[in-house]
Amino acid sequence: IAKYLFVVIIFMGIISSLSLLVMASNKSDAEAINISGSLRMQSYRLLTEMERSPNTVEQNLVRYQDSLNANVLLTVQNQLFAPSGIKASYQKILQRWMMMSDFARAHQIEKYHAELKSYVQDVDDFVLELQRFAEKKWIIAVSVLCISMLLILAMVSYVIWYMKREVVKPLELMTKASMQVQ
């Protein structure tokens, strides 16, 4: 009986560890979605800055570059199970941004404006990929937890059945026999 209970405890420990790992990675997903979503607004703001106050463009480019290279976005790229679509989307944004930042530095407002809608669509695609990945991880986590709970329930049910068969019934028989002897 002790062996079975020990297996249940080990199994619960493994499940808890896996769940914590998945939940920890989901925490960074929300931050990645927020930062990548802010890239859209920042790129539009940069266009406005180019038109109204060109002397602040370089400062805004640095801020944008910091957001684009945020640690959480780089971490998503290196996650073991990150889909190739996320990685490709991020690389596409990085490549496109090189061109967009060149337009901004050269104050080529028309070229920047002409590419902006397409660039923002690429950012939207990246955000959508991040959201889908986060949703998949959440579904996997919930599925693993449900299956694990069912397995634990099955193991505990087996232990209870085993105890009834191997411990309770023999004790009942011994009690009956001792009552008959008395």
Q: Can you name each region flagged by the protein language model?
A:
Residues 19-26, 152-168:
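Cytosolic-side ends of inner-membrane transmembrane helices, especially those
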Residues 166-182:
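Membrane-proximal alpha-helical signal-transduction linkers
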Residues 8-16, 145-156, 160:
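Alpha-helical transmembrane segments of integral membrane proteins
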Residues 30, 138-148, 169:
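Interfacial "cap-and-anchor" motif at the non-cytosolic start of specific transmembrane alpha-helices
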Residues 33, 38, 42-49, 88-140:
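Extracytoplasmic
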Residues 49-103:
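Extracytoplasmic ligand-binding sensor domains of the Cache superfamily
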Residues 22-47, 58, 62:
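Juxtamembrane membrane-water interface segments immediately C-terminal to a transmembrane helix
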